[in-house]
From Swiss-Prot:
Species name: Microcebus sambiranensis
Secretion signal span: none
TM spans (from-to): 20-42, 60-80, 98-118, 147-167, 194-214, 224-244, 256-276, 284-303, 308-330, 351-373, 391-411
Name of protein: NADH-ubiquinone oxidoreductase chain 4
Subunit structure: Core subunit of respiratory chain NADH dehydrogenase (Complex I) which is composed of 45 different subunits.
GO biological process: electron transport coupled proton transport; mitochondrial electron transport, NADH to ubiquinone; mitochondrial respiratory chain complex I assembly
GO molecular function: NADH dehydrogenase (ubiquinone) activity; ubiquinone binding
EC top class, as a word: translocase
Amino acid sequence: MLKIIMPTIMLFPVIWYSNNTMIWINMTSYSLMISLMTLPLLNQTENNSNNFSLTFFSDSLSSPLLMLTVWLLPLMIMASQHHLTKESLMRKKLYLSMLIFLQMFLIMTFTATELILFYILFESTLIPTLIIITRWGNQTERLNAGLYFLFYTLIGSLPLLVALIYVQNSLGSLNYLVMNMWSQDMSGLWSSNLLWLACIMAFMVKMPLYGLHLWLPKAHVEAPIAGSMVLAAVLLKLGGYGMLRLTMILNPTTKIMAYPFIMLCLWGMIMTSSICLRQTDLKSLIAYSSVSHMALVIVAILMQTPWSFMGATALMIAHGLTSSMLFCLANSNYERIHSRTMLLARGLQAFLPLMATWWLLASLTNLALPPFINLIGELFVIMASFSWSNLTIIMTGFNMLITALYSLYMLTMTQRGKFTYHIHNIKPSYTRENTLMSMHMLPLIMLTFNPKIIMGLTY
């Protein structure tokens, strides 16, 4: 584990001691090397868990998420290069330092064995993200977005801390590996329902559950490109990861408590998909589509069947890469026409034909076109929920239809049509941007050929 954490820490001297003209090249190449070092994690052992030490471990759930986190850092650095050109050197270095802090916390969160350590790291990811949003965001509303983000996350996760201390006192240990083997039935306690709610609420806010999702569109719209990418691709997955870990431990109670949440998610996923059809702001549309996809993941996790767990893990990884790519594309539009309004970006296909190809691919992966891993994840979840109740097929089928509609709406609004006359002297698409898009697309295509490596614990 240290061979991933230590090189990540050594990125700090790379930033602060590099030659000023070489910062971007050094950072990108070094972080890409670190991401390639995580590839052996795909080769999971037979008993499904690599225990590196008493503090860190990885299994077939945490290693795909860990790889996604590490893979995203070079992509964030490549995407941020243009909008930091006018910033002073000191601020560039601070921005990159924040990204590395965030990556370090995320790596340790996904591999922590002890629940209190997991909680501390889970909360500390908030600090660099908040600084990135409130310092490098585009408009003054970023402060409001930062406040929403901070208070939703903090208030949601305070009950988790109380619940963890209570469990520590009653069981004597908060180690995942010990608690999975714990035979005592938690549902015998009078407070088991409250305990379940306290444990799960933090992750429901982070996912976010429909109704607790108001911080997400605000944070996404105001964040700079790297903030949006890491928020969509990894920070939302922290919620799913925590839920997958904790629902297994709190198991008998989950069967009773899951009903209202599953209904709310099935309803919320259709509502947020419908909101997407009415959006004019491109980043806001992608943010609401994230809420809709994550609702499907919550449904899958609460179903508690092997199939739904596999679907949830596959969907989390697929959505991480897809939404990150969509935010990059939205940012490349924003850098050229300085507006997030889709109506003003129409007709860009004539100017940037290669970008239009990336838009097409990203939209198709977002609407879960057959060969892609997105469809595999969605189908697993839909089949698991169908076996839970036949009526869910109406909701999930309707959701897939609306997802296809808003993905194609987004594509046609930004690429097709007659271009507006205020668009002039548009820069061509850079090699940097094309590389960035292909580095999002490549893992998606490769996972399509071998999806079993991201199917999680129950494969």
